[in-house]
Curated annotation (Swiss-Prot):
Nuclear hormone receptor that can act as a repressor or activator of transcription. High affinity receptor for thyroid hormones, including triiodothyronine and thyroxine. Pfam families: Hormone_recep (PF00104), zf-C4 (PF00105). The modification Phosphoserine is found at S12, S28. Composed of three domains: a modulating N-terminal domain, a DNA-binding domain and a C-terminal ligand-binding domain. The gene is THRA. The keyword Plastid does not apply. SMART domains: HOLI, ZnF_C4. One of its GO terms (biological process) is thyroid hormone receptor signaling pathway. Belongs to the nuclear hormone receptor family. NR1 subfamily. Probably interacts with SFPQ. It comes from Pygoscelis adeliae. This is Thyroid hormone receptor alpha. Keywords: DNA-binding, Metal-binding, Nucleus, Phosphoprotein, Receptor, Transcription, Transcription regulation, Zinc, Zinc-finger. Zn(2+) 2 binds at C89, C95, C105, C108.
Length: 402
């Protein structure tokens, strides 16, 4: 008995009908795209889905049909350049089109494209394609900005406890930061002739203007004292053993003093204001003994000027520098680490509250901690050279301690 083909058997239908009437499977894959050895495959395609024109591996939904990249390009070029009227067939338009024969007859290939449903009206000419791409890019940029604004709106602001901590840290900074917000009006400029004539030779070949060095050492003791006072006003710091307090202060003192100088960078005059009172130029600070450290602090000042930090942000950054659990010799490492995490979290939430316009503001600001660490390391190396050559009486005792 002859077996009739089942109507449910897709092989019993004509090839073109199967491609036209068959429903496309759309899988909810775990990732947005499927990758294979042959390249990019959109998530809505089956792994081995074939081009409805030639049977080659399909790459996507092109001009209303699932096709390969080759047939997509052939169809687009044919329409854009109006080539189809010039096509002809040697075999009365009866060629079978597959991935082997598709390049042998342009007319039959084009007829196959039309018969399976590829839409001529969807092909854009060059000017329209450029306009479409521009529109896509504009929409993408708009969505990116909207998502960024949305993410900023959903970032947490400080809690009530964090606001209390932020207030304490800010007041500690303001009460120990010389001249406060009036530093520009109260600063005094180091005379031009000081720091311009290097005199004493150093072991590494550099020279130091001892007059400039002497001026700097006059303000170093009160600057260190203010950093110590700042630390003592922080409740978490005062709860630590005295041994740990000393180690933390020695570790952060140069970092905090450098930060306080850097945020008082004046781009118009090209000066830094040290200890809130002495405005110096780059060359003066260099010749006064700091050399490469001078460049690092000035460069930090220039970069920080774009951040427009307020007193609270400077204060919290100082607290983060102070509570560094990686200082050598600490006893209560875990406690100090938790203290720093508390400051960091309050700091991050305050940054969210401030809503800065600089992209990636928070991670960029944290990178300044690394810069300040490098300044401290350079200063320590420089100080060893200076101790050898400069008279010991020029160094204040407290400066020698830290």
């Amino acid at each position: 008995m002859e077996q009739k083909p089942s109507t449910l058997d897709p092989l019993s239908e004509p090839e073109d009908t199967r491609w036209l009437d068959g429903k496309r499977k759309r899988k909810s894959s775990q990732c947005l795209v499927k990758s294979s050895m042959s390249g990019y495959i959109p998530s809505y395609l089956d792994k081995d889905e074939q081009c409805v024109v030639c049977g080659d591996k399909a790459t996507g939904y092109h001009y209303r049909c699932i096709t390969c990249a080759g047939c997509k390009g052939f169809f687009r070029r044919t329409i854009q350049k109006n080539l189809h009227p010039t096509y002809s067939c040697k075999y009365d338009g009866c060629c079978v089109i597959d991935k082997i024969t598709r390049n042998q007859c342009q007319l039959c290939r084009f007829k196959k494209c039309i018969s399976v449903g590829m839409a001529m009206d969807l092909v854009l000419y060059d000017s329209k394609r450029v306009a479409k791409r521009k529109l896509i890019e504009e929409n993408r940029e708009r969505r990116r900005k909207e998502e960024m604004i949305k993410s900023l709106q959903h970032r947490p602001n400080p809690s009530a406890e964090e606001w209390e901590l932020i207030h304490v840290v800010t007041e500690a900074h303001r009460s120990t930061n010389a001249q406060g917000s009036h530093w520009k009006q109260k600063r005094k400029f180091l005379p031009e002739d000081i720091g311009q004539s290097p005199m004493a030779s150093m072991p590494d070949g550099d020279k130091v203007d001892l007059e400039a060095f002497s001026e700097f050492t006059k303000i170093i003791t009160p600057a260190i004292t203010r950093v110590v006072d700042f630390a003592k006003k922080l409740p978490m710091f005062s709860e630590l053993p005295c041994e740990d307090q000393i180690i933390l202060l020695k570790g952060c003192c140069m970092e905090i003093m450098s930060l306080r100088a850097a945020v008082r960078y004046d781009p118009e005059g090209g000066t830094l204001t040290l200890s809130g009172e002495m405005a110096v130029k780059r060359e003066q600070l260099k010749n006064g003994g700091l050399r490469v450290v001078s460049d690092a602090i000035f460069d930090l000042g220039k970069s920080l000027s774009a951040f427009n930090l307020d007193d609270t942000e400077v204060a919290l950054l100082q607290a983060v520098l102070l509570m560094s659990s990686d200082r050598t010799g600490l006893i209560c490492v875990e406690k100090i680490e938790k203290c720093q995490e508390t400051y960091l979290l309050a700091f991050e939430h305050y940054i969210n509250y401030r809503k800065h316009n600089i992209p990636h503001f928070w991670p960029k600001l944290l990178m300044k901690v690394t810069d300040l660490r490098m300044i401290r390391a350079c200063h320590a190396s420089r100080f060893l050279h200076m101790k050898v050559e400069c008279p010991t009486e020029l160094f204040p005792p407290l400066f020698l301690e830290v």
